[in-house]
Protein backbone atom coordinates (compact mmCIF):
# COMPACT_ATOMS: atom_id res chain seq x y z
CA UNK A 1 0.00 0.00 0.00
CA UNK A 2 0.98 3.60 -0.35
CA UNK A 3 3.78 4.95 1.82
CA UNK A 4 2.71 7.11 4.76
CA UNK A 5 0.81 5.94 2.08
CA UNK A 6 4.42 5.03 1.94
CA UNK A 7 6.54 4.53 4.94
CA UNK A 8 6.82 0.78 4.63
CA UNK A 9 10.13 -0.89 3.96
CA UNK A 10 11.34 -4.05 2.24
CA UNK A 11 14.35 -6.34 2.45
CA UNK A 12 16.38 -7.35 -0.61
CA UNK A 13 15.76 -11.07 -0.71
CA UNK A 14 14.36 -12.02 -4.09
CA UNK A 15 10.83 -13.34 -3.93
CA UNK A 16 9.39 -15.71 -6.49
CA UNK A 17 5.72 -15.96 -7.39
CA UNK A 18 3.73 -18.62 -5.61
CA UNK A 19 1.74 -20.03 -8.46
CA UNK A 20 2.29 -21.29 -12.01
CA UNK A 21 -0.93 -20.86 -13.96
CA UNK A 22 -2.60 -24.10 -14.98
CA UNK A 23 -1.24 -26.10 -12.06
CA UNK A 24 -3.40 -27.42 -9.25
CA UNK A 25 -2.08 -25.96 -6.03
CA UNK A 26 -2.85 -26.80 -2.45
CA UNK A 27 -1.10 -24.68 0.14
CA UNK A 28 -0.83 -26.35 3.53
CA UNK A 29 -0.21 -24.54 6.77
CA UNK A 30 3.42 -25.05 7.73
CA UNK A 31 3.05 -25.74 11.19
CA UNK A 32 -1.64 12.15 17.84
CA UNK A 33 -1.84 15.30 16.27
CA UNK A 34 0.36 16.71 19.01
CA UNK A 35 3.99 17.31 18.13
CA UNK A 36 4.89 17.31 21.81
CA UNK A 37 5.89 14.41 24.02
CA UNK A 38 3.68 11.54 25.13
CA UNK A 39 3.87 9.74 28.42
CA UNK A 40 5.08 6.15 28.04
CA UNK A 41 2.43 4.94 30.46
CA UNK A 42 -0.32 2.94 28.75
CA UNK A 43 -4.01 3.00 29.53
CA UNK A 44 -4.51 -0.55 28.25
CA UNK A 45 -4.21 -3.64 30.41
CA UNK A 46 -1.16 -5.91 30.42
CA UNK A 47 2.38 -5.43 31.63
CA UNK A 48 4.17 -5.48 28.28
CA UNK A 49 2.46 -2.83 26.13
CA UNK A 50 4.71 -1.41 23.39
CA UNK A 51 4.27 2.21 22.30
CA UNK A 52 5.06 2.65 18.60
CA UNK A 53 5.10 5.47 16.07
CA UNK A 54 1.90 6.00 14.12
CA UNK A 55 0.24 8.52 11.83
CA UNK A 56 -3.44 9.40 11.77
CA UNK A 57 -5.26 6.99 9.40
CA UNK A 58 -6.72 8.75 6.39
CA UNK A 59 -9.67 6.36 6.22
CA UNK A 60 -11.93 4.41 8.59
CA UNK A 61 -10.36 1.17 9.85
CA UNK A 62 -12.26 -0.89 7.28
CA UNK A 63 -9.72 -3.25 5.64
CA UNK A 64 -10.93 -2.56 2.10
CA UNK A 65 -10.90 1.21 2.61
CA UNK A 66 -7.35 1.46 3.89
CA UNK A 67 -4.78 2.35 1.23
CA UNK A 68 -2.04 4.01 3.31
CA UNK A 69 0.34 2.93 6.02
CA UNK A 70 -1.19 4.96 8.84
CA UNK A 71 -4.27 2.75 8.72
CA UNK A 72 -2.66 -0.25 7.04
CA UNK A 73 -0.30 -1.01 9.88
CA UNK A 74 -3.22 -0.90 12.31
CA UNK A 75 -5.56 -3.04 10.22
CA UNK A 76 -2.84 -5.64 9.65
CA UNK A 77 -2.64 -6.21 13.42
CA UNK A 78 -6.41 -6.46 13.93
CA UNK A 79 -7.32 -8.85 11.12
CA UNK A 80 -6.15 -12.22 9.76
CA UNK A 81 -6.66 -13.33 6.17
CA UNK A 82 -6.47 -16.55 4.20
CA UNK A 83 -2.66 -16.57 4.10
CA UNK A 84 0.33 -14.86 5.70
CA UNK A 85 3.82 -14.13 4.40
CA UNK A 86 7.06 -15.06 6.13
CA UNK A 87 10.24 -12.96 6.24
CA UNK A 88 11.36 -14.33 2.86
CA UNK A 89 8.02 -13.76 1.15
CA UNK A 90 6.92 -17.37 1.49
CA UNK A 91 3.18 -18.02 1.69
CA UNK A 92 1.59 -19.90 4.59
CA UNK A 93 -2.07 -20.65 5.17
CA UNK A 94 -3.66 -18.85 8.07
CA UNK A 95 -7.47 -18.96 8.04
CA UNK A 96 -7.36 -21.00 4.82
CA UNK A 97 -7.05 -24.76 5.12
CA UNK A 98 -6.32 -25.04 1.40
CA UNK A 99 -6.47 -23.02 -1.81
CA UNK A 100 -6.76 -25.15 -4.94
CA UNK A 101 -6.36 -23.82 -8.48
CA UNK A 102 -7.67 -25.31 -11.73
CA UNK A 103 -8.66 -24.35 -15.28
CA UNK A 104 -5.51 -22.37 -16.04
CA UNK A 105 -5.75 -20.33 -12.82
CA UNK A 106 -9.29 -19.13 -13.58
CA UNK A 107 -10.99 -21.23 -10.89
CA UNK A 108 -10.12 -21.52 -7.21
CA UNK A 109 -11.69 -23.51 -4.39
CA UNK A 110 -10.88 -22.23 -0.90
CA UNK A 111 -11.38 -24.29 2.23
CA UNK A 112 -11.66 -22.34 5.50
CA UNK A 113 -10.48 -23.69 8.86
CA UNK A 114 -13.09 -24.21 11.53
CA UNK A 115 -12.81 -22.69 15.00
CA UNK A 116 -11.78 -19.14 14.11
CA UNK A 117 -13.84 -16.32 15.58
CA UNK A 118 -13.98 -12.55 15.65
CA UNK A 119 -13.35 -10.62 18.84
CA UNK A 120 -17.13 -10.17 19.26
CA UNK A 121 -17.42 -13.96 19.56
CA UNK A 122 -19.06 -14.59 16.18
CA UNK A 123 -17.53 -17.29 13.93
CA UNK A 124 -15.33 -16.63 10.91
CA UNK A 125 -16.95 -18.44 7.98
CA UNK A 126 -16.92 -18.43 4.20
CA UNK A 127 -19.60 -15.74 4.35
CA UNK A 128 -17.23 -13.51 6.36
CA UNK A 129 -14.82 -13.46 3.43
CA UNK A 130 -17.30 -13.38 0.55
CA UNK A 131 -19.42 -10.62 2.08
CA UNK A 132 -16.30 -8.53 2.73
CA UNK A 133 -14.98 -9.04 -0.81
CA UNK A 134 -18.32 -8.14 -2.37
CA UNK A 135 -18.57 -4.99 -0.25
CA UNK A 136 -15.05 -3.86 -1.12
CA UNK A 137 -15.38 -4.60 -4.85
CA UNK A 138 -18.65 -2.67 -5.22
CA UNK A 139 -17.87 0.89 -6.34
CA UNK A 140 -20.96 2.25 -4.58
CA UNK A 141 -19.20 1.55 -1.28
CA UNK A 142 -16.18 3.67 -2.26
CA UNK A 143 -13.51 1.30 -0.97
CA UNK A 144 -9.99 2.21 -2.07
CA UNK A 145 -8.95 -1.41 -2.59
CA UNK A 146 -11.72 -2.37 -5.03
CA UNK A 147 -9.24 -3.09 -7.83
CA UNK A 148 -7.75 -5.99 -5.86
CA UNK A 149 -10.81 -7.95 -7.03
CA UNK A 150 -10.68 -6.89 -10.68
CA UNK A 151 -10.05 -10.40 -12.03
CA UNK A 152 -13.12 -11.96 -10.34
CA UNK A 153 -16.15 -12.49 -12.60
CA UNK A 154 -18.69 -9.69 -12.28
CA UNK A 155 -16.23 -7.02 -11.18
CA UNK A 156 -16.90 -4.74 -14.17
CA UNK A 157 -20.64 -4.77 -13.44
CA UNK A 158 -19.93 -3.50 -9.93
CA UNK A 159 -18.07 -0.48 -11.34
CA UNK A 160 -21.10 0.99 -13.12
CA UNK A 161 -22.23 4.39 -11.85
CA UNK A 162 -25.75 3.18 -11.01
CA UNK A 163 -24.75 -0.07 -9.30
CA UNK A 164 -26.81 -1.22 -6.32
CA UNK A 165 -24.62 -1.09 -3.16
CA UNK A 166 -25.75 -4.62 -2.33
CA UNK A 167 -24.84 -6.08 -5.75
CA UNK A 168 -22.30 -8.90 -5.61
CA UNK A 169 -19.53 -10.49 -7.66
CA UNK A 170 -21.02 -13.19 -9.87
CA UNK A 171 -17.80 -15.20 -9.61
CA UNK A 172 -18.06 -15.70 -5.85
CA UNK A 173 -20.10 -18.52 -4.36
CA UNK A 174 -20.42 -19.76 -0.80
CA UNK A 175 -20.60 -23.55 -1.19
CA UNK A 176 -20.98 -24.14 2.54
CA UNK A 177 -19.89 -22.42 5.76
CA UNK A 178 -16.26 -23.32 5.14
CA UNK A 179 -15.93 -23.48 1.34
CA UNK A 180 -15.66 -20.67 -1.21
CA UNK A 181 -15.80 -21.14 -4.99
CA UNK A 182 -14.09 -18.39 -7.01
CA UNK A 183 -14.41 -18.00 -10.77
CA UNK A 184 -12.19 -15.46 -12.51
CA UNK A 185 -12.75 -13.56 -15.74
CA UNK A 186 -9.12 -14.14 -16.75
CA UNK A 187 -6.20 -16.22 -15.50
CA UNK A 188 -4.71 -14.78 -12.32
CA UNK A 189 -1.81 -16.77 -10.95
CA UNK A 190 -1.27 -14.09 -8.28
CA UNK A 191 -4.71 -14.59 -6.72
CA UNK A 192 -3.56 -16.82 -3.82
CA UNK A 193 -0.65 -14.47 -3.13
CA UNK A 194 -2.80 -11.34 -2.89
CA UNK A 195 -5.41 -13.10 -0.74
CA UNK A 196 -3.25 -12.30 2.29
CA UNK A 197 -3.46 -8.53 1.76
CA UNK A 198 -5.77 -6.54 4.01
CA UNK A 199 -8.16 -5.94 1.09
CA UNK A 200 -9.07 -9.63 1.44
CA UNK A 201 -9.60 -9.70 5.21
CA UNK A 202 -12.89 -11.18 6.54
CA UNK A 203 -15.52 -9.03 8.22
CA UNK A 204 -18.20 -9.88 10.81
CA UNK A 205 -21.88 -9.18 10.16
CA UNK A 206 -21.72 -6.08 12.36
CA UNK A 207 -19.48 -4.37 9.80
CA UNK A 208 -22.32 -4.17 7.28
CA UNK A 209 -25.05 -3.21 9.75
CA UNK A 210 -23.26 0.03 10.64
CA UNK A 211 -20.12 0.56 8.50
CA UNK A 212 -19.44 4.03 9.95
CA UNK A 213 -19.45 2.74 13.52
CA UNK A 214 -17.36 -0.27 12.54
CA UNK A 215 -14.72 1.93 10.91
CA UNK A 216 -14.23 3.67 14.26
CA UNK A 217 -14.47 0.49 16.36
CA UNK A 218 -13.31 -2.45 14.23
CA UNK A 219 -13.95 -6.05 15.21
CA UNK A 220 -11.30 -8.37 13.81
CA UNK A 221 -9.81 -11.85 14.06
CA UNK A 222 -6.11 -10.93 14.13
CA UNK A 223 -3.33 -11.11 16.72
CA UNK A 224 -4.66 -8.02 18.51
CA UNK A 225 -8.05 -6.81 19.74
CA UNK A 226 -9.05 -3.18 19.19
CA UNK A 227 -9.42 -1.03 22.33
CA UNK A 228 -9.73 2.62 21.29
CA UNK A 229 -9.00 5.27 18.67
CA UNK A 230 -8.45 8.75 20.05
CA UNK A 231 -8.19 10.71 16.82
CA UNK A 232 -4.88 12.46 16.23
CA UNK A 233 -3.56 11.02 19.47
CA UNK A 234 -3.47 7.22 19.70
CA UNK A 235 -4.85 3.86 18.62
CA UNK A 236 -4.68 1.18 21.30
CA UNK A 237 -4.99 -2.59 21.04
CA UNK A 238 -4.34 -5.60 23.28
CA UNK A 239 -3.31 -9.18 22.54
CA UNK A 240 -6.17 -11.31 21.25
CA UNK A 241 -6.29 -14.48 23.41
CA UNK A 242 -8.47 -16.27 20.85
CA UNK A 243 -6.18 -15.71 17.87
CA UNK A 244 -5.28 -19.01 16.14
CA UNK A 245 -2.85 -17.92 13.45
CA UNK A 246 0.83 -17.67 12.61
CA UNK A 247 1.51 -14.26 14.19
CA UNK A 248 0.96 -14.76 17.92
CA UNK A 249 2.02 -11.61 19.77
CA UNK A 250 4.94 -11.80 22.19
CA UNK A 251 3.81 -8.57 23.86
CA UNK A 252 0.55 -7.72 25.62
CA UNK A 253 -0.51 -5.00 23.22
CA UNK A 254 0.38 -1.99 21.11
CA UNK A 255 -0.22 1.71 21.50
CA UNK A 256 0.14 3.46 18.14
CA UNK A 257 1.01 7.01 19.19
CA UNK A 258 -0.02 9.43 16.46
CA UNK A 259 2.45 12.12 15.50
CA UNK A 260 2.40 14.90 12.94
CA UNK A 261 6.19 14.89 12.77
CA UNK A 262 8.72 12.02 12.77
CA UNK A 263 11.16 14.43 14.42
CA UNK A 264 8.86 14.67 17.44
CA UNK A 265 8.53 10.90 17.58
CA UNK A 266 12.29 10.48 17.43
CA UNK A 267 12.75 13.04 20.21
CA UNK A 268 10.22 11.16 22.34
CA UNK A 269 12.07 7.91 21.66
CA UNK A 270 15.38 9.40 22.78
CA UNK A 271 13.65 10.75 25.88
CA UNK A 272 12.12 7.39 26.77
CA UNK A 273 8.55 8.42 25.98
CA UNK A 274 8.17 6.16 22.92
CA UNK A 275 9.36 2.56 22.63
CA UNK A 276 9.77 2.11 18.87
CA UNK A 277 9.67 4.06 15.60
CA UNK A 278 10.12 2.96 11.99
CA UNK A 279 10.10 6.58 10.74
CA UNK A 280 13.62 7.95 11.12
CA UNK A 281 13.55 11.69 10.30
CA UNK A 282 15.93 12.88 7.62
CA UNK A 283 17.61 15.10 10.23
CA UNK A 284 18.71 11.97 12.12
CA UNK A 285 19.79 9.68 9.27
CA UNK A 286 23.45 10.64 9.67
CA UNK A 287 23.52 10.10 13.43
CA UNK A 288 20.91 7.56 14.52
CA UNK A 289 23.15 4.51 14.07
CA UNK A 290 25.81 5.97 16.39
CA UNK A 291 23.37 7.37 18.96
CA UNK A 292 24.16 5.57 22.23
CA UNK A 293 20.82 6.52 23.79
CA UNK A 294 18.86 4.21 21.47
CA UNK A 295 19.06 0.96 19.51
CA UNK A 296 19.30 1.52 15.75
CA UNK A 297 18.30 -0.83 12.93
CA UNK A 298 19.26 -0.51 9.27
CA UNK A 299 19.05 -3.25 6.67
CA UNK A 300 18.77 -3.34 2.87
CA UNK A 301 15.28 -2.49 1.75
CA UNK A 302 13.23 -1.65 -1.25
CA UNK A 303 10.11 0.42 -0.72
CA UNK A 304 9.72 2.56 -3.80
CA UNK A 305 9.77 6.34 -3.47
CA UNK A 306 8.38 8.29 -6.42
CA UNK A 307 6.47 11.42 -7.30
CA UNK A 308 3.46 11.60 -9.58
CA UNK A 309 2.74 14.26 -12.20
CA UNK A 310 -0.97 13.76 -12.93
CA UNK A 311 -1.98 13.97 -16.56
CA UNK A 312 -4.74 16.50 -15.89
CA UNK A 313 -2.12 19.20 -15.26
CA UNK A 314 -1.55 21.67 -18.09
CA UNK A 315 1.46 20.68 -20.24
CA UNK A 316 1.49 17.12 -18.78
CA UNK A 317 -1.13 15.21 -20.75
CA UNK A 318 -0.53 11.67 -21.97
CA UNK A 319 0.85 12.97 -25.24
CA UNK A 320 4.18 13.89 -26.80
CA UNK A 321 4.54 17.15 -24.88
CA UNK A 322 3.64 15.55 -21.55
CA UNK A 323 6.03 12.64 -22.03
CA UNK A 324 8.88 14.94 -23.03
CA UNK A 325 8.36 17.12 -19.96
CA UNK A 326 8.16 14.17 -17.55
CA UNK A 327 11.34 12.67 -19.03
CA UNK A 328 13.11 16.04 -18.83
CA UNK A 329 12.14 16.50 -15.19
CA UNK A 330 13.27 12.96 -14.34
CA UNK A 331 16.67 13.50 -15.96
CA UNK A 332 17.08 16.80 -14.08
CA UNK A 333 17.38 14.99 -10.75
CA UNK A 334 20.70 13.75 -9.33
CA UNK A 335 19.33 10.79 -7.38
CA UNK A 336 22.78 9.55 -6.32
CA UNK A 337 23.84 12.82 -4.71
CA UNK A 338 20.54 13.20 -2.85
CA UNK A 339 20.86 9.60 -1.63
CA UNK A 340 24.30 10.41 -0.25
CA UNK A 341 23.63 13.88 1.17
CA UNK A 342 20.09 13.56 2.50
CA UNK A 343 19.49 9.84 2.99
CA UNK A 344 23.07 9.17 4.13
CA UNK A 345 23.13 6.12 1.83
CA UNK A 346 20.05 4.53 3.40
CA UNK A 347 18.51 4.58 -0.08
CA UNK A 348 19.61 3.63 -3.60
CA UNK A 349 18.64 5.30 -6.90
CA UNK A 350 15.71 3.60 -8.63
CA UNK A 351 16.34 1.66 -11.83
CA UNK A 352 12.75 0.51 -12.45
CA UNK A 353 9.23 0.72 -11.00
CA UNK A 354 9.40 -2.15 -8.52
CA UNK A 355 11.80 -3.15 -5.77
CA UNK A 356 14.78 -5.44 -5.33
CA UNK A 357 12.93 -8.13 -3.30
CA UNK A 358 10.61 -8.88 -6.22
CA UNK A 359 11.73 -11.36 -8.87
CA UNK A 360 10.81 -9.11 -11.83
CA UNK A 361 13.18 -6.37 -10.60
CA UNK A 362 15.72 -5.46 -13.29
CA UNK A 363 18.58 -3.01 -13.78
CA UNK A 364 18.57 -3.56 -17.55
CA UNK A 365 15.22 -2.32 -18.79
CA UNK A 366 15.12 -0.58 -22.15
CA UNK A 367 14.61 3.14 -21.62
CA UNK A 368 15.82 3.32 -18.03
CA UNK A 369 18.26 6.08 -18.98
CA UNK A 370 15.40 8.48 -18.16
CA UNK A 371 16.12 7.66 -14.51
CA UNK A 372 19.73 8.85 -14.75
CA UNK A 373 20.99 12.38 -14.13
CA UNK A 374 21.61 14.02 -17.50
CA UNK A 375 21.03 17.80 -17.36
CA UNK A 376 22.09 18.34 -20.96
CA UNK A 377 19.55 15.83 -22.28
CA UNK A 378 16.92 17.18 -19.89
CA UNK A 379 17.30 20.67 -21.37
CA UNK A 380 17.02 19.26 -24.91
CA UNK A 381 13.81 17.40 -24.10
CA UNK A 382 12.33 20.45 -22.35
CA UNK A 383 13.12 22.58 -25.41
CA UNK A 384 11.37 20.04 -27.66
CA UNK A 385 8.31 20.24 -25.43
CA UNK A 386 8.41 24.04 -25.56
CA UNK A 387 8.39 23.84 -29.36
CA UNK A 388 5.07 22.02 -29.11
CA UNK A 389 3.59 24.35 -26.47
CA UNK A 390 5.61 27.06 -24.66
CA UNK A 391 5.93 26.52 -20.90
CA UNK A 392 4.16 28.89 -18.54
CA UNK A 393 3.58 28.97 -14.80
CA UNK A 394 5.41 27.11 -12.04
CA UNK A 395 6.09 23.49 -11.19
CA UNK A 396 5.28 22.27 -7.68
CA UNK A 397 5.57 19.02 -5.73
CA UNK A 398 3.15 18.56 -2.82
CA UNK A 399 3.96 16.42 0.22
CA UNK A 400 2.66 15.74 3.73
CA UNK A 401 4.66 17.73 6.28
CA UNK A 402 4.10 15.14 9.03
CA UNK A 403 6.24 12.62 7.11
CA UNK A 404 9.91 12.52 6.15
CA UNK A 405 9.70 14.08 2.67
CA UNK A 406 10.55 17.75 3.23
CA UNK A 407 14.30 17.68 2.57
CA UNK A 408 14.28 15.45 -0.49
CA UNK A 409 11.31 17.20 -2.09
CA UNK A 410 13.07 20.55 -1.68
CA UNK A 411 16.27 19.07 -3.13
CA UNK A 412 14.41 17.75 -6.17
CA UNK A 413 12.74 21.10 -6.76
CA UNK A 414 16.13 22.82 -6.65
CA UNK A 415 17.52 20.43 -9.27
CA UNK A 416 14.51 20.97 -11.54
CA UNK A 417 14.72 24.75 -11.10
CA UNK A 418 18.44 24.93 -11.80
CA UNK A 419 18.45 22.48 -14.72
CA UNK A 420 15.37 23.63 -16.60
CA UNK A 421 15.43 27.29 -15.51
CA UNK A 422 11.81 27.24 -14.36
CA UNK A 423 10.11 28.17 -11.10
CA UNK A 424 9.92 24.93 -9.10
CA UNK A 425 8.89 24.71 -5.46
CA UNK A 426 7.80 22.31 -2.74
CA UNK A 427 4.21 22.51 -1.46
CA UNK A 428 3.80 21.25 2.14
CA UNK A 429 0.41 20.04 3.40
CA UNK A 430 0.21 19.88 7.17
CA UNK A 431 -1.01 16.30 7.67
CA UNK A 432 -1.16 12.95 5.90
CA UNK A 433 -4.94 13.10 6.19
CA UNK A 434 -5.15 16.41 4.29
CA UNK A 435 -2.62 15.28 1.72
CA UNK A 436 -4.21 11.90 1.04
CA UNK A 437 -7.71 13.36 0.89
CA UNK A 438 -6.56 15.57 -1.97
CA UNK A 439 -4.77 12.68 -3.69
CA UNK A 440 -7.69 10.27 -3.33
CA UNK A 441 -10.25 12.79 -4.58
CA UNK A 442 -8.18 13.78 -7.61
CA UNK A 443 -7.99 17.39 -6.45
CA UNK A 444 -4.23 17.80 -6.66
CA UNK A 445 -3.25 20.85 -8.72
CA UNK A 446 0.45 20.00 -8.74
CA UNK A 447 2.75 17.00 -8.79
CA UNK A 448 2.86 15.10 -5.48
CA UNK A 449 5.04 12.65 -3.60
CA UNK A 450 4.09 9.02 -3.95
CA UNK A 451 5.58 5.58 -3.56
CA UNK A 452 4.66 2.05 -2.59
CA UNK A 453 5.25 -0.66 -0.03
CA UNK A 454 3.99 -4.15 -0.83
CA UNK A 455 0.64 -5.58 0.20
CA UNK A 456 1.78 -8.95 -1.11
CA UNK A 457 5.05 -10.24 -2.63
CA UNK A 458 4.44 -9.96 -6.37
CA UNK A 459 5.23 -7.51 -9.18
CA UNK A 460 1.47 -7.45 -9.74
CA UNK A 461 1.12 -5.42 -6.55
CA UNK A 462 3.47 -2.72 -7.79
CA UNK A 463 2.42 -2.57 -11.42
CA UNK A 464 -1.24 -3.58 -11.72
CA UNK A 465 -2.33 -1.88 -8.50
CA UNK A 466 -0.55 1.38 -9.37
CA UNK A 467 -0.70 1.76 -13.15
CA UNK A 468 -3.32 -0.56 -14.66
CA UNK A 469 -6.54 1.06 -15.89
CA UNK A 470 -8.50 -1.19 -13.53
CA UNK A 471 -6.88 0.63 -10.59
CA UNK A 472 -7.75 4.15 -11.80
CA UNK A 473 -10.75 6.34 -11.00
CA UNK A 474 -10.62 5.72 -7.25
CA UNK A 475 -10.68 1.90 -7.50
CA UNK A 476 -7.05 1.36 -6.48
CA UNK A 477 -3.64 2.95 -6.17
CA UNK A 478 -3.58 4.52 -9.65
CA UNK A 479 -4.17 8.02 -8.24
CA UNK A 480 -2.90 9.78 -11.38
CA UNK A 481 -5.53 7.92 -13.47
CA UNK A 482 -2.92 6.70 -15.96
CA UNK A 483 -4.47 4.53 -18.67
CA UNK A 484 -2.60 2.76 -21.45
CA UNK A 485 -4.23 -0.29 -23.12
CA UNK A 486 -0.82 -1.54 -24.27
CA UNK A 487 0.41 -1.63 -20.68
CA UNK A 488 -2.82 -3.28 -19.48
CA UNK A 489 -2.38 -6.02 -22.09
CA UNK A 490 1.12 -6.79 -20.80
CA UNK A 491 -0.21 -7.12 -17.26
CA UNK A 492 -2.91 -9.54 -18.44
CA UNK A 493 -0.26 -11.64 -20.18
CA UNK A 494 1.86 -11.69 -17.02
CA UNK A 495 -1.04 -12.95 -14.90
CA UNK A 496 -1.75 -15.66 -17.50
CA UNK A 497 1.86 -16.81 -17.81
CA UNK A 498 2.67 -20.47 -17.04
CA UNK A 499 5.76 -19.68 -14.96
CA UNK A 500 7.34 -16.97 -12.85
CA UNK A 501 10.08 -16.48 -15.43
CA UNK A 502 7.56 -15.99 -18.23
CA UNK A 503 5.45 -13.63 -16.12
CA UNK A 504 8.49 -11.55 -15.26
CA UNK A 505 9.23 -11.01 -18.96
CA UNK A 506 5.79 -9.48 -19.45
CA UNK A 507 6.06 -7.41 -16.28
CA UNK A 508 9.37 -6.03 -17.55
CA UNK A 509 7.92 -5.26 -20.99
CA UNK A 510 5.17 -3.40 -19.19
CA UNK A 511 7.75 -1.44 -17.22
CA UNK A 512 9.45 -0.40 -20.45
CA UNK A 513 6.15 1.19 -21.49
CA UNK A 514 6.04 2.99 -18.14
CA UNK A 515 9.56 4.30 -18.70
CA UNK A 516 8.30 6.05 -21.83
CA UNK A 517 5.16 7.48 -20.22
CA UNK A 518 6.42 8.01 -16.63
CA UNK A 519 3.01 8.06 -14.90
CA UNK A 520 5.15 8.35 -11.77
CA UNK A 521 8.83 9.24 -11.64
CA UNK A 522 10.86 6.58 -9.77
CA UNK A 523 13.39 8.07 -7.36
CA UNK A 524 14.80 5.64 -4.78
CA UNK A 525 14.42 2.32 -3.02
CA UNK A 526 14.90 2.86 0.70
CA UNK A 527 16.42 0.71 3.40
CA UNK A 528 14.42 -0.62 6.32
CA UNK A 529 15.39 1.72 9.15
CA UNK A 530 14.04 1.85 12.69
CA UNK A 531 14.98 2.71 16.25
CA UNK A 532 13.93 1.62 19.72
CA UNK A 533 14.74 2.29 23.33
CA UNK A 534 17.36 0.06 24.95
CA UNK A 535 14.60 -1.81 26.80
CA UNK A 536 13.02 -3.10 23.59
CA UNK A 537 14.06 -6.37 21.95
CA UNK A 538 12.74 -8.64 19.23
CA UNK A 539 12.91 -6.02 16.48
CA UNK A 540 12.44 -7.78 13.13
CA UNK A 541 11.28 -6.90 9.64
CA UNK A 542 8.84 -8.68 7.36
CA UNK A 543 9.40 -9.63 3.70
CA UNK A 544 8.76 -6.03 2.75
CA UNK A 545 10.99 -4.56 5.43
CA UNK A 546 8.06 -3.42 7.57
CA UNK A 547 8.33 -3.89 11.34
CA UNK A 548 6.96 -7.12 12.81
CA UNK A 549 5.02 -5.60 15.69
CA UNK A 550 4.02 -8.96 17.16
CA UNK A 551 7.70 -9.77 17.84
CA UNK A 552 8.42 -6.68 19.96
CA UNK A 553 9.01 -7.06 23.70
CA UNK A 554 10.53 -4.83 26.38
CA UNK A 555 12.12 -5.20 29.78
CA UNK A 556 9.94 -4.07 32.64
Q: Where does each model-flagged region fall?
A:
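Alpha-helical secondary-structure segments
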Residues: 125-134, 177-184, 222-223, 251-253, ...
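Long beta-strand-rich cores associated with HINT superfamily self-processing modules
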Residues: 530-556
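Structural transition elements
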Residues: 348-385, 402-407
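Surface-exposed binding/hinge segments that line
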Residues: 111, 128, 135-137, 141-204
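N-terminal lobe/hinge region of extracytoplasmic solute-binding protein
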Residues: 53-103, 219
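Gly/Pro-rich hinge or "lid" segments in bacterial periplasmic/extracellular proteins
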Residues: 184-249, 253
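Ligand-site clamp/hinge motif
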Residues: 209-215, 234, 242-287, 302
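Extracytoplasmic/peripheral linker and loop segments enriched in polar/acidic and small residues
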Residues: 173, 339, 423-435, 464-533, ...
